[in-house]
């Protein structure tokens, strides 16, 4: 069954669910760490493009983590 979401959005939302029990800032860091360690750069670029286009179906935790990764290290 497909929900019509781009794969990187669906995956980011699924990852966020795993860290939703944490305080928001901790969850952002954990999701961002996961993305940094396991995602190919093109996946993150696609997710950031989705956010830039409005990203209506992205979990707030996933969106904050992606924005965190947008910042220079």
Can you describe what each PLM-predicted range is?
Residues 13, 63-66:
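Residues within alpha-helical segments
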Residues 5, 9-10, 29, 51, ...:
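N-terminal intrinsically disordered, cationic/polar leader segments
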Residues 66-73:
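Short, charged, intrinsically disordered terminal tails
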Residues 15-60:
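Amphipathic, hydrophobic secondary-structure cores in small proteins
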